[in-house]
Design a protein with these regions (language model features):
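Alpha-helical transmembrane segments in inner-membrane proteins
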Residues: 1-337
Length: 337
């Protein structure tokens, strides 16, 4: 029996929630010392072996929560931007928003290492300013192109390249220790992160998700032309701006906490849309998919390989082939991007 669109989305969300809980339990159970389910439950409530309690509550739990909120933020941000711009490639990392957040964050790191006054600016604040600055530049440069999705995408790619060059230059102005730390962060890493890193992203997700859900009905209408949505009493331009502001904020906060973890925002929305079998991208489902991707990649990066890899390395290995697939779609006659 074929489910109605919203029922299909609800079923996909339920499956994703169950999968997320299973992955989170596994992530908190594996490490230098494996933990069985009974030990894990006792440790979460602060009882049992002290070493296990410390490993679970002070080391694994903060990292798992950070992976979840960073992945969810990237997933929701990517789903929103792809839906608003009607382009499966229009994710914050491709458009240059993540690059803007990165150059601002690395700039703060570099100036802070030199003892400059800007170095006291918190990295999440710098990342937000950088992300919104990049978005404003994309909008300004894309104004003459009529804000069409494909034109904005090309502008974003060009801007991202320029911002990446600036970031690389900033690395050359830092000392060896600072440059190594920043370079590790730029690959997308959750190593040595804790509750302080997760809190700004968690707040951002808690604020943005209700806004996105409130705009959900209007957002689904964006797959139609503005002339048609006006007849339904929906201001398409205002809804797009509000949603893109939410997308930029989430992408910038996620970047500040985990670095520019590549391809999560790009992949999550498309996986969510296919899983739900609907025309639009369900943002909540995209967030769940993003959380699962980052958590699985982070767990594998610290347990499967002899050395602990940055999570961005694994997401890039998976995401790059998917990007090539999206680029090949027009040649197969499935519609231009």
């Amino acid at each position: 029996m074929r489910l109605k669109p919203r029922a299909s989305v609800a079923r996909a969300i339920a499956i994703a929630v169950v999968a997320l809980l299973v992955v989170a339990a596994v992530a908190m159970s594996v490490g230098d010392r494996a933990t069985n389910p009974a030990e894990l439950l006792r440790a979460l409530f602060g009882s049992g072996d002290e070493n296990v309690v410390y490993a679970v509550r002070e080391v694994r739990l903060p990292r798992v929560v950070l992976a979840l909120v960073v992945g969810a933020a990237f997933g929701i941000a990517g789903g929103i931007s792809q839906g608003v711009l009607r382009n499966p490639l229009a994710s914050p990392d491709v458009l240059g928003v993540s690059a803007g957040a990165s150059v601002a964050a690395v700039g703060v790191m570099a100036i802070g290492a030199l003892g400059g006054p800007i170095g006291v600016v918190p990295i999440p604040v710098a990342a937000l300013l950088g992300g919104f600055g990049a978005a404003a530049l994309i909008a300004a440069l894309g104004f003459g192109a009529g804000f069409r999705g494909r034109s904005l995408l090309l502008v974003g790619i060009a801007l991202s390249t320029a911002l990446t060059g600036i970031t690389q230059y900033l690395l050359t102005r830092m000392d060896v220790s600072g440059a190594q730390s920043a370079a590790s962060w730029l690959t997308g890493s959750l190593n040595a992160r804790g509750w302080d890193d997760a809190l700004p992203v968690l707040i951002g997700v808690a604020v943005v998700v209700p806004i996105v859900l409130i705009l959900g009905h209007s957002a689904r209408a964006l797959i139609f032309e503005d002339d048609l949505t006006k007849n339904w009493g929906i201001n398409g331009s205002a809804v797009r701006v509000a949603l893109l502001v939410c997308s930029v904020a989430l992408a910038a906060l996620a970047t500040s906490a985990g670095g520019p973890i590549g391809f999560v925002a790009l992949v999550s929305g498309q996986v969510a849309r296919r899983a739900a079998r609907v025309a639009d991208i369900p943002p909540l489902l995209a967030g769940l998919v993003g959380a699962i991707i980052v958590l699985v990649a982070d767990t594998a990066s610290r347990t499967v390989f002899p050395v602990q890899l940055p999570v961005g390395v694994l997401t890039a290995i998976v995401g790059a082939p998917y990007l090539l697939y999206l680029l090949q779609r027009p040649r197969r006659g499935r519609g231009a991007l």
